[in-house]
């Protein structure tokens, strides 16, 4: 197994190197939590300094509220500003249940509380809310009022049992959707956490669930998300899709593998008449694959589904399903984003069923007769208009579903490869939200990716018909003070806001902060943020309906040469010359930090008005991310250094450093005295005076020497009484005279 795992790791590294390059991409801008607060573009809300495990469970853009569940609290926050007018309900578990929970050996802090895990809109005035209830789930109706201005938020009913609606264990995911005042949940239905089910409750009809203790249906699932998706024009054909991962035993029966899955059911399923009574008769599932293919055809999987986001369109069949996947390997840490066409998912569910056959129980396509109506078809829909309920399904249809719930073909992503891969990083992706943005040169998708380190990456994905490569990390935001993992994330394209939660609180950030990219047109253009454009004065929000003549944006190429003419581009590409000194045989550092980590740096050296030549790097001359380190400085190192940054084929000079080398002997004499200028009195005893130094060193050079002497004496040297200058005075005089003669040769002749 270890050999196979290592082979998988090498396969991913080979794939990643060939497709994306060897280095991991970096964000153009990184903002810490404090820096984000200083921009005054974010809001943060919490009700306690203690972590309360916040989860954003419902966003209602019609009432301008987002609803958050946490330990013992239900929160209603203003969608425009979560810090303004927050409403909360304190809803703890009963004291008896908390005590029973502790006596059962459950965690008093992270288990024996009422962790709110279900908030669904029941009708226009009420929410239906469920919590873990200290391992005894409970549910209530909450009155939120008809309009948000009413500021109504209160529990409006007695507690009722939440069994079959919310998991007992708050650390086990519960997913749910509400349709016509009926609740559909994916959770564990028992105290011990052994009976997983997809359950319909809160219904005037009979309750329905998955077949109990049938590993063909569910095998130790961890539920991730649930969505209602139309299937054609007939509303009776709509399906509820449940996304989860489960542990499956391999054919040998000895090893359990994790597979990511999609299951679907018909909301109007009422179970079978004689078989599968009060069980789903339309339950089907298929494997969801996110993998990379090695050169030898070996497939390596990102097998653990973490989150799902549906990017809807006017046509439901063109809906895109984005998924976050991570590796289950203990050898390395990796995550990926895969994207699926809904039409491809539906094609798999309309394809062959899986069937186990032979002594090794290998999966093969089912070759027998498929009963009518096709298993998985909803009653009363386009294909079964005369069947009002699943109880009218023939027995062979129900029996087939019980024994063949799995589809043979897996569901592959677009192009059969991940959109984004991260390996060898100190983080994993945990959550995803996606926005569709109209830029000046086309439509693109912007991904907001939450990590287990409490940050959010903003990534733009360029369409494949663009000449540029697929992804760019525009920003990385530290949305929480601690490194607590992102637990939920909601996006509002209407409000242009992103809402993020972790165990410590909820943060709201806008989808764009255009001014952080810089104050020049080139900075704005190089950022390639589809939300932003240069308006002639600053980098600001881009509106596709505005006048394009005055808006400069180039997401496709990010080329300032074509977009920023007339905006002081020549001055921007140059840098003012500075002077820096180094001492022979010592180490010096020429500082040059690029504005973007996505830029590459090249150092050029120009000597005595000669042509610029690229600096040859060696063990003595080392390029770092912050500049150029020169060890054991030599006379040959003097000259004019140019630090050139290249980003997206756009070159600019970040620094011009006129590097001058001081003679070691001269500095040694000068650093011998306590006062930086007392050496002059000793020099007066010779045949020359301090004025002789005017020709040897310029005013700036003397200032540099003075500072160097001061710094040298502060490095732990013991203070000494002034004494006569030691050393060979004749050697010092010869050194100064030679320096004066060199300077005279470089001076212009008198006119």
Curated annotation (Swiss-Prot):
Disulfide bonds join 101-112, 130-139, 266-378, 290-338, 514-532, 643-709. Residues 28-511 form the Sema domain. Residues 712-751 are annotated as: Disordered. Residues 1-21 form the signal peptide. Glycans are attached at residues 81, 123, 268, 465, 585-586. The keyword S-adenosyl-L-methionine does not apply. Residues 712-731 have a biased composition (Basic and acidic residues). GO terms for molecular function: chemorepellent activity; neuropilin binding; semaphorin receptor binding. It is found in: Secreted. GO terms for cellular component: extracellular space; plasma membrane. It comes from the Eukaryota. Collapsin-1, -2, -3, and -5 bind to overlapping but distinct axon tracts. Residues 571-655 form the Ig-like C2-type domain. One of its GO terms (biological process) is negative chemotaxis. Induces the collapse and paralysis of neuronal growth cones. Could potentially act as repulsive cues toward specific neuronal populations. Binds to neuropilin. Belongs to the semaphorin family. This is Semaphorin-3C. The lineage of its organism: Eukaryota, Metazoa, Chordata, Craniata, Vertebrata. The gene is SEMA3C.
């Amino acid at each position: 197994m270890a050999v196979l795992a290592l082979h998988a790791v090498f396969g991913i590294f080979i794939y990643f190197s060939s497709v994306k390059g060897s280095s991991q991409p970096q964000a153009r801008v990184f903002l810490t939590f404090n820096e984000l607060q200083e921009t005054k573009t974010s809001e943060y809300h919490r009700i306690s300094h203690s972590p309360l495990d916040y989860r954003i469970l419902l966003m209602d853009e019609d009432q301008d509220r987002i609803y958050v569940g946490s330990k013992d609290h239900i929160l209603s926050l203003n969608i425009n500003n979560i810090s303004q007018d927050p409403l909360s309900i304190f809803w703890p578990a009963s004291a008896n249940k908390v005590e029973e929970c502790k006596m059962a050996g459950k965690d008093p802090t992270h288990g024996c509380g009422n962790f709110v895990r279900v908030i669904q809109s029941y009708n226009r005035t009420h929410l239906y809310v469920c919590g873990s209830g200290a391992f005894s789930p409970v549910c209530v109706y909450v009155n939120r009022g008809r309009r948000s201005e009413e500021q109504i938020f209160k529990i409006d009913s007695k507690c009722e049992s939440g069994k079959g609606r919310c998991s007992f264990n708050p650390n086990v995911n519960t997913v749910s959707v509400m349709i016509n005042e009926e609740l559909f949940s994916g959770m564990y239905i028992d105290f011990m956490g052994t009976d997983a089910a997809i359950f319909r409750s809160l219904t005037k009809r009979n309750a329905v669930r998955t077949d109990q203790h049938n590993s063909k249906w569910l095998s130790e699932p961890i539920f991730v998300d649930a969505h209602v998706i139309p299937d054609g024009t007939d509303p009776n054909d709509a399906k509820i899709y449940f996304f989860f991962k489960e542990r499956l035993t391999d054919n040998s029966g000895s090893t359990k593998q994790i597979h990511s899955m999609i299951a679907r059911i018909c909301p109007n399923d009422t179970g079978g008449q004689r078989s599968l009574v009060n069980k789903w008769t339309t339950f089907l599932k298929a494997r969801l694959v996110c993998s990379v293919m090695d050169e030898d055809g070996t497939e390596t999987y990102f097998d653990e589904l973490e989150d799902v986001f549906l990017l809807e369109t006017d046509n439901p069949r063109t809906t895109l399903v984005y998924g976050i996947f991570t590796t289950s390997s203990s050898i390395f840490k990796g995550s990926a984003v895969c994207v699926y066409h809904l039409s491809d998912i539906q094609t798999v569910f309309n394809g062959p069923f899986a069937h186990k056959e032979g002594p090794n129980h290998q999966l093969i396509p089912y070759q027998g007769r498929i009963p009518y109506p096709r298993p998985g078809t909803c009653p009363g829909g386009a294909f079964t208009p005369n069947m009002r309920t699943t109880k009218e399904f023939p027995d062979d249809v129900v029996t087939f579903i019980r024994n063949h719930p799995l589809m043979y073909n897996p569901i592959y992503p677009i192009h059969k490869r991940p959109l984004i891969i991260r390996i060898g990083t100190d983080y994993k992706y945990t959550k995803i939200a996606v926005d569709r943005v109209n830029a000046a040169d086309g439509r693109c998708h912007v991904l907001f990716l939450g990590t287990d380190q409490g940050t959010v990456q903003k990534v733009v994905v360029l369409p494949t018909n663009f000449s540029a490569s697929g992804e760019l990390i525009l920003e990385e935001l530290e949305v929480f003070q601690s490194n607590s993992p992102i637990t939920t994330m909601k996006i509002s394209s209407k409000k242009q806001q992103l809402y993020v939660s972790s165990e410590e609180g909820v943060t709201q950030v806008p989808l764009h902060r255009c001014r952080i990219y810089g104050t020049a047109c080139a900075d704005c253009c190089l950022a390639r943020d589809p939300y932003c454009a240069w308006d002639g004065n600053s980098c600001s929000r881009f509106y596709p309906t505005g006048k394009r003549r005055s808006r400069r944006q180039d997401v496709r190429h990010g080329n300032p040469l074509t977009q920023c003419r007339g905006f002081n581009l020549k001055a921007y590409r140059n840098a003012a010359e500075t002077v820096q000194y180094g001492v022979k045989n010592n180490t010096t550092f020429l500082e040059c930090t690029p504005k973007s980590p996505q830029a590459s740096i090249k150092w050029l050296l120009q000597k005595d008005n000669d042509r610029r030549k690229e600096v040859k790097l060696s063990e003595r001359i080392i390029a770092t991310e912050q500049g150029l380190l020169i060890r054991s400085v030599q006379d040959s190192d003097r000259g004019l250094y140019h630090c050139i940054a290249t980003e997206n084929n756009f070159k600019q000079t970040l620094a011009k450093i006129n590097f001058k080398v001081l003679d070691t002997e001269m500095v040694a004499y000068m650093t011998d005295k306590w006062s930086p200028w007392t050496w002059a009195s000793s020099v007066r005893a010779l045949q020359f005076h301090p004025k002789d130094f005017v020709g040897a060193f310029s005013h700036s050079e003397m200032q540099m020497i003075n500072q160097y002497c001061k710094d040298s004496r502060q490095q732990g040297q013991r203070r000494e009484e002034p004494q006569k200058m030691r050393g060979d005075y004749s050697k010092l005089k010869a050194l100064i005279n030679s320096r004066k003669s060199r300077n005279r040769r470089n001076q212009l002749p008198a006119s």
